[in-house]
Amino acid sequence: MLFQLFDHPWPPFPFVSVMILRYSLYAVKGELDMSVSPGRTIRVGLALVLVGSTLSVAAQTATARIVTAANTFLSKLDEKQRQSVLFAFDDEKQRARWSNLPVSMVARAGLGLKDLNADQRAAAMALVSSALSPRGFEKVEQIVEGDELLKTKGGNNPMFGKDLYFISILGKPSERLPWMVQFGGHHLALNITIAGERGVLTPTLTGAQPALYTLDGKTVRPLGQESDKALALLNALDEGQRKQAVLGFQTADLVLGPGQDGKTIQPEGLKATAMNDKQRAMLLDLISEWANIIHESAAGARMAELKADVRETWFAWSGPTTADPGKNITAYYRVQGPHLVIEYAPQKLGGDLSMHVHTMYRDPTNDYGRGLTVK
């Protein structure tokens, strides 16, 4: 039926590919010319449909990749290990069993990396990597490496180190039905829900201590962009906007951190309706530091949702409005919208607020993928 809409036969595949590429580029630019012939107008519309289908195929491919990685990991475990790593998808106790604290202070369930052999451990990290973007996985690695530094520079303190991270799977890995991957330990809690072609990364906690270190001769700031982009946005505000954004009181820690599932908070600060286009673009760029941790297909869908919400999004700041060059800010900030809460909270433990930070990323309407329905 669709092909018969044209006033001539559907062209062979190579021409279709060229046509889709040509007209999808015009569509992305918003340069549709409605004065063209009816056949070509229909082609543009069809190109948009097919471009959307291409994005859907990419998401399906990502899901298949994650499922394959999960099944590969499970195949390398013995029966006792599989019993330890697998939970029911609706296990609320396991969903909420995450924290910013070391595992010696808040126990995790699942399988610890220390209990895996080299092959199993590589498969576990391949599963985590498959669900994340390259930059997202790099952040995870940098957070874990920072914890290893806490161990080695603290006299091999058994509270810290890259062995003390846990992985669990909630539900059965599926390309259609919902299931979850959890990975975390000190300063890290990833809750990744996969439901068909959709992916959800909330709630997720990322933190860093040290927030600045040297590894193999390179300077590493695991959450440096989260600091720098926020300060750049603050500095882009005019005096009146800053007065609204900067709160008149001190916020010292995460408000909606671990143990706060299902709760919310009144938006504060500067609403993005009072920002200009450039400032709103900077706000979205800041948000992307969290939204883009997950794999690209899911991140693209998430950013589209957050862009649609941007005018209803708030930016609030509490604390010093400057930072030393190359170091993180020592102020708390929050970004909040209809489907979003981001918090950035420097920590006093360690003495230098720029060297210890906790961040939180939530979707109050869809944490743990609760808002997803399977088609």
What are these regions (language model features)?
Residues 60-375:
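A cross-kingdom marker for long, charged
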Residues 5:
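Cationic, low-complexity basic patches in intrinsically disordered or flexible, solvent-exposed regions
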Residues 45-54:
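Bacterial N-terminal signal peptides
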Residues 15-18, 22-33:
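Short, Lys/Arg-enriched N-terminal segments with co-localized hydrophobic residues
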Residues 35-45:
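Bacterial N-terminal signal peptides that target proteins for export
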Residues 55-59:
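Sec/Tat signal peptide C-region and signal peptidase I cleavage site
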